[in-house]
Amino acid sequence: MAAPAQPKKIVAPTVSQINAEFVTQLACKYWAPHIKKKSPFDIKVIEDIYEKEIVKSRFAIRKIMLLEFSQYLENYLWMNYSPEVSSKAYLMSICCMVNEKFRENVPAWEIFKKKPDHFPFFFKHILKAALAETDGEFSLHEQTVLLLFLDHCFNSLEVDLIRSQVQQLISLPMWMGLQLARLELELKKTPKLRKFWNLIKKNDEKMDPEAREQAYQERRFLSQLIQKFISVLKSVPLSEPVTMDKVHYCERFIELMIDLEALLPTRRWFNTILDDSHLLVHCYLSNLVRREEDGHLFSQLLDMLKFYTGFEINDQTGNALTENEMTTIHYDRITSLQRAAFAHFPELYDFALSNVAEVDTRESLVKFFGPLSSNTLHQVASYLCLLPTLPKNEDTTFDKEFLLELLVSRHERRISQIQQLNQMPLYPTEKIIWDENIVPTEYYSGEGCLALPKLNLQFLTLHDYLLRNFNLFRLESTYEIRQDIEDSVSRMKPWQSEYGGVVFGGWARMAQPIVAFTVVEVAKPNIGENWPTRVRADVTINLNVRDHIKDEWEGLRKHDVCFLITVRPTKPYGTKFDRRRPFIEQVGLVYVRGCEIQGMLDDKGRVIEDGPEPRPNLRGESRTFRVFLDPNQYQQDMTNTIQNGAEDVYETFNIIMRRKPKENNFKAVLETIRNLMNTDCVVPDWLHDIILGYGDPSSAHYSKMPNQIATLDFNDTFLSIEHLKASFPGHNVKVTVEDPALQIPPFRITFPVRSGKGKKRKDADVEDEDTEEAKTLIVEPHVIPNRGPYPYNQPKRNTIQFTHTQIEAIRAGMQPGLTMVVGPPGTGKTDVAVQIISNIYHNFPEQRTLIVTHSNQALNQLFEKIMALDIDERHLLRLGHGEEELETEKDFSRYGRVNYVLARRIELLEEVKRLQKSLGVPGDASYTCETAGYFFLYQVMSRWEEYISKVKNKGSTLPDVTEVSTFFPFHEYFANAPQPIFKGRSYEEDMEIAEGCFRHIKKIFTQLEEFRASELLRSGLDRSKYLLVKEAKIIAMTCTHAALKRHDLVKLGFKYDNILMEEAAQILEIETFIPLLLQNPQDGFSRLKRWIMIGDHHQLPPVIKNMAFQKYSNMEQSLFTRFVRVGVPTVDLDAQGRARASLCNLYNWRYKNLGNLPHVQLLPEFSTANAGLLYDFQLINVEDFQGVGESEPNPYFYQNLGEAEYVVALFMYMCLLGYPADKISILTTYNGQKHLIRDIINRRCGNNPLIGRPNKVTTVDRFQGQQNDYILLSLVRTRAVGHLRDVRRLVVAMSRARLGLYIFARVSLFQNCFELTPAFSQLTARPLHLHIIPTEPFPTTRKNGERPSHEVQIIKNMPQMANFVYNMYMHLIQTTHHYHQTLLQLPPAMVEEGEEVQNQETELETEEEAMTVQADIIPSPTDTSCRQETPAFQTDTTPSETGATSTPEAIPALSETTPTVVGAVSAPAEANTPQDATSAPEETK
């Protein structure tokens, strides 16, 4: 197997290169945004740039990046575009810029939407250019650029401007391009289309000739483009050299065809045109397919196109076709061929009279039709309306190979999509893992096209939706597997031994050499299948490794996935491995197969089962694991061995590799998706079309649902009637009681429900009444029934005063339908979610709600807030891992809940015993839940009924107040409640108290009745299943857990009515969809009533490690984001309470009307300034340190030493002023920088109690969903903006801080970036040097924005700050030390021991020696040992590559007068204890 060539990484230009470029000089003259006086527009500039910069460099990405980054499209090209100045260079320049925007994944159409006037003219010229001759004005490379532009247009149908142009190309009139017989056949199939067709012809006759000609050109555009492509394809030779321009053109064209076929609006009309052109037949017979190297990607794309042309869907209705309907279509085709053969071709009688199953294979079709002449084959095809009729006495122009393939490919039996899927192995093999077209490397630049499905806005059917996600999920996990295999195998250093075998010169934690491998079982296939039901094997390894690694291997659990690898190295012993060269050649990798652990075998060869029992201790170091192999893969390998004489793969394995369990769940998720595709997915009717991206996007909104609920109990949502009125601005609120004293929460609100259907009323007065009625809310205060006399009986209440948009979100979430809540940072998303859950729980006690989040952290936050509301904890259940991080003492996991139920049962039975004793009833009523039930029925109820009969109303007179207390039968039981129980003020009040007491007693027995099942079910597993299926009302899990455990949940009969998803914009499309189907449908219908998604699509999307899947396939698009793009109505929360208003301004431009809650203006912490710092936020410019800005010791492992040291110096400065270290977090945009900063902190101040460590040092991506008071942010890059150009990352970075944000960056680079302008224009309005107030301690009373009374110091650069902090620390130590001496008169012994450092200092003679000691306690600025972080696998690098070395000389002195570090601290200098003294280095001691 040929190893893939290592692709080159595109190096982004540096700032100095950008400034030196000709383009930049032109930009500064004509269009740069920061230039005030610009030169007038000159068309020649565009011509020159296109010819000299773009064409001359063969469309080099670097040049196009520069142009696009300089805002060439926005500020020059489109701003000045008009038909008068349009030219080839102008058109091509715009197309290049748009394509580059798509490649960079930044919004491309905004500028066109702002100035749409000339777009139709521009688009028509693009169409004209795309059809131009390849040897004419437009070269093939230029036409490939145009094809890519058109592909982007067809994939942007959600943009009105684009859609209006594209619709003219793809609609029913495009069938003009069909041959007449085929057109008649299609119109006959769908009769209603003939009516439209006649109407189109009639309208065409009314058009003037010029407009008609223009319309005809647009309608025939795609037909002509196909013909043009076929001519280019035919010009590719079989073996002679071919230009790559031709190959790329063909690949891009097929990509365009796939995208047109995979979208229903375009497919509906285009599929017939494509079929009539026989494009697939031409392609499969072309020379390009036969060229192995050049045509490999083309062939893969062609297979995708073939799949979509035959997709199981009715093009006109959009309905998915069933297996039976597909079979019927196939039979109809064969029988029509047989009828034509019988009627007109006597030589085909045998074929015509055979049954379908005999003749519908490729072999039999070739046998019958192969002997026929070309003319006869043409006639057969014309009878089927596949080709135009052949005129008499004329020979066909098509060759025989084409005609035969046309008939055979059309009529051969196809394997169904679901069968193909079921026969597919789930584990990747070496052929897929290292195929660059399917699993590209990390260096994917976005230039070429790939044989990958795309996730856009719409899907053909649910099967198509699941299949695309299945393939992408499989390939994304394959990419990660490839990285793991390459890492583990290269660490093992496989070399060829002297005798030709394998010898391993290294070792790997995650891989072991295999000692023996045996297949032990191949089970019989199921009926109708040709692969075994089960294949098991035994793998023996020798665990001669450290104990903790041995424990990891022995800890492999059932269902863990491992990989079996065969290597046959050709390199001799001792050869060095070079990571920059292709991996496969170096290690000699031959095979990779996946397997799933069943268990480890004991001494007797039996599988050791997972369970609570301790594992047996096995002797020796040899361990054998029983594994399941993939039956489909095994079948394919065995067939290959038997039929083709290939070697038996299963006798060659010599390495087994395991993976981290957290990253190794791909097989379970793939199995879940495959199971979904094999079952009838019943998505609720009201969601089906929205999920596929069709129909009215607002159809699932509660206002359009037929089962809208008029009256809702808002429980404790409102704090007062004023809060309620403020929550519905523009509504007329009518309260059913007039007494203000009674207008207290909780409230029931009756909303006016509009029925969707109704007669139109013409009377204006009636309309006014309607509007008035529609805005009237009827509010009914009600009293929660008394729950008992104990303080804990009182319900917990919400204390948050929700805003009116939050109330709208809560209202929408309580109503049936789809609710989408967009929650910007700090707007209370979690509080809204919790209130919705609580309100559903109280309004619909019989319903069950499923909570799904992206992370365990979010789930824990939800649970902690749910606990604070009035929800009975016995109804809460948490599935999956992560509950150990919950900051509550309660365990909500399955077994935690089982233990809670058992403990609660004992508590309640004790209460029953106490009640029994108080009533003087003999016997043992509290023995079981059952006996307690009988006790309640015969002893408690009888007494209560007797009591009620005594105290109830007798006629018109009320009973005496004292009677309520006198006759009460449970006085003794309630003796431990706060006394007196009865107030004696009124009969109604005392009667309510009595009923409350009885409710308390009744609740005991109700709970015992529920817990009775735990007496009958004996095992913990059965009890936990019962809890899940019957008891729990609110069930929470992560999306990953849902995907892994769907099969088990469905098998248990798990049911739920509502789903609430938090962090919905961070969840993968497929992981959002699976939770909808965790239950089997009832009578063919889903019982799902509500789907609430809460997220923020302006923050970071799901994490996809491979750039190709992220960008090309758009796999990072969450379902939430797609719904927003499609136009599903959202509730946008619009008031934040996290950050200062000034900090909020840095990101609120990204949201609709995001304002601040009142407390952000009023609370002292928000109005007070940040002590010691002049500004609450500041952008600090960091220039190169020692001539180095960003460095990249490994690909994409970016570091910036200057910024890292500066950030740490500011952190230390803040801590020295008195800021708590845990209130400061340090964020950066790259992993490399994160590791470097951590190293510097460890070195400088990590173990110093005076300073300590910040709360977190992590990346912006990892910190999403968290916050802290003060954020120090390092942007790292100095050559190119990098991935901060994604505005979503910028929003996350800017919105993590509550009180202070300090950003360290190369300002000249970031201020020019168009996407970042709204934030950076505010940041650059303030000085770019750090302004500090060293004499102002924390906390301060100075108001934010006030001029300080202390002196402000301006820090110009990092060395200055480092030295300043160093001196400040030294001053603080000396002052503290002096203060201690005056205050503490220590005993002589302690002075001797505790002031070792001071004694040393006094003995030293020179200032220089004194500084040496201090520098031992605080590493001096010449100490650079932590300068540059490099990962463990770093290859040898020179100082110039890494930016610094570990020698003291690498960083010169930062100041003449002080020892010059980038100065910071490793231990406090007031070493008053022996322990502190020992922390100094050895030399000092």
Curated annotation (Swiss-Prot):
Annotated binding of ATP, by residue? 801, 806, 826-831
Quote the EC number.
3.6.4.13
Q: Which residues carry this modification: N6-acetyllysine?
A: 1051
The reaction(s) annotated as catalysed by this protein in its Swiss-Prot or TrEMBL entry are:
ATP + H2O = ADP + phosphate + H(+)
**An annotated Gene Ontology molecular function:** ATP hydrolysis activity
Polar residues: compositionally biased ranges? 1421-1448
Q: Which residue pairs form cystines in this protein?
A: none
Q: Where found, per UniProt?
A: Nucleus; Nucleus, Nucleoplasm
Q: Looking at the record's lineage, which domain of life comes first? A: Eukaryota
A single BP term in Gene Ontology:
mRNA splicing, via spliceosome
Family, according to the entry, reads as follows: Belongs to the CWF11 family.
Q: What is this protein called?
A: RNA helicase aquarius
> What is the species of this protein?
Homo sapiens
